[in-house]
A protein has these predicted regions:
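Secreted, periplasmic, or luminal enzymes acting at the cell surface/secretory milieu
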Residues: 1-124, 186, 192-193
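Sec/Tat-exported extracytoplasmic proteins
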Residues: 12, 29-30, 40, 74, ...
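Intrinsically disordered or highly flexible coil/loop and linker segments, enriched in small
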Residues: 18, 79, 120-126, 198, ...
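Intrinsically disordered, low-complexity Ser/Thr/Gly-rich stretches
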Residues: 46, 67, 76-77, 89-215
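Short, solvent-exposed coil/turn linker segments
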Residues: 101-104, 168, 219-226, 259-267, ...
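Low-complexity, Pro/Ser/Thr- and charge-rich linker/hinge segments at domain boundaries
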Residues: 209-229
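Extended, compositionally biased non-globular segments
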Residues: 243-304
């Protein structure tokens, strides 16, 4: 019936005087301003825990990891019945002038975010402004967006107020097991202001950097792509590629050969270093030489 009515009043656990509150809202004596603190899926099977709950005997597997609630529906591209943060009002609100205090900050600093909200209707009302952050260039899997703050503003009809948010290191960080702490990866972060997780009104961006370095230690089980991911390892990766090219001959003499070379390089990026030793037509790549290159690279990184 949800698509056949103009509105649904969700009262949750309203308490002893819930009837008085319902009357005030239904007859327009008060303006509703609540927002959903959860996602309402269209089907039970859309729930992120559908395949794992209630588990096996006494064990429950929380396989959804960090992708719970709106994070799961955003990642999967599933349209929910009602999204996280959704809520209607008897008036309307317009968002404008989303600004950040800095365009680039260090992770030990605090970023101030401000957005103007205007009551564009003819009734007084309250709006809950939601602020989401997204890591645009993350090397680890993170949610499409994460709620990092919200502000409730009371606005008279036609009035404009400013919602102010303060984002610290935790607002941009993810938990990194290698350092047993929260870690901010350098890159661009998208700042979004919206009325719900699916009703994003404005966005801007900021670059965040950190002096914290993740420990790096390579072995023969490290892939060539991981070696190539850091500046110190790129020379080693290029050396490996050049030796393989020599072993296989000139693979780039025509368009077909160029495609084959590109495909081989992509394949090599996913190979552990120990696998390269099996290339019998590349005699210069031996286990001993690979071990020496890895040891030299680790020593170089340790000196930094």
């Amino acid at each position: 019936f949800a698509d056949k009515v103009k509105g649904i009043l969700e009262m949750y656990l309203g308490g002893q005087n819930i009837g008085t509150a319902e009357k005030a809202l239904l007859f327009g004596e008060a303006n509703p301003s609540g927002k959903l603190a959860e996602t309402f899926p269209e089907k039970l099977s859309h729930n992120p825990s559908y395949l794992n709950f209630p588990g096996n005997m006494d064990d429950v597997d929380y396989a959804e990891g960090i992708f719970v609630g709106y994070r799961y529906y955003d990642e999967k591209g599933i349209n929910p019945l009602f999204p996280f943060g959704h809520g209607l009002s008897y008036t309307t609100f317009e968002y404008s002038n989303l600004t950040v205090s800095e365009n680039e900050i260090k992770d030990d600093k605090t970023l101030t975010v401000m957005v103007d909200v205007t009551n564009t209707g003819d009734r007084d009302g309250m709006e809950i402004v939601q602020l989401y952050v997204s890591d645009k260039e993350s090397s680890v899997r993170r949610p499409v967006r994460e709620l990092k703050g919200f502000e409730k503003l009371f606005l008279k009809a036609g009035e404009t107020k400013k919602a102010v948010f303060h984002l610290d290191k935790r607002s941009f960080a993810y938990y990194e097991p290698d350092i047993h702490d929260w870690f901010v990866e350098y890159g661009e972060f998208i700042i979004e202001a919206g009325s719900s997780s699916r009703d994003i009104r404005l966005s801007t961006s900021v670059y965040v950097s950190s002096d914290t370095k993740l420990p790096v230690h390579f072995t023969l089980n490290t892939t060539c792509g991981e070696i190539n991911s850091i500046p110190e390892g790129r020379a080693m990766f290029e050396n490996i590629l050049s030796q393989i090219d020599c072993g296989f001959g000139d693979t780039a003499s025509d368009d077909l050969g160029a495609s084959a070379k590109e495909m081989m390089e992509a394949m090599i990026r996913d190979m552990p270093l120990r696998t390269l030793v099996t290339f019998t037509n590349v005699p210069d790549i031996t286990r001993a030489k690979m071990s020496e290159m890895v040891e030299n690279l680790n020593e170089m990184l340790a000196e930094k």
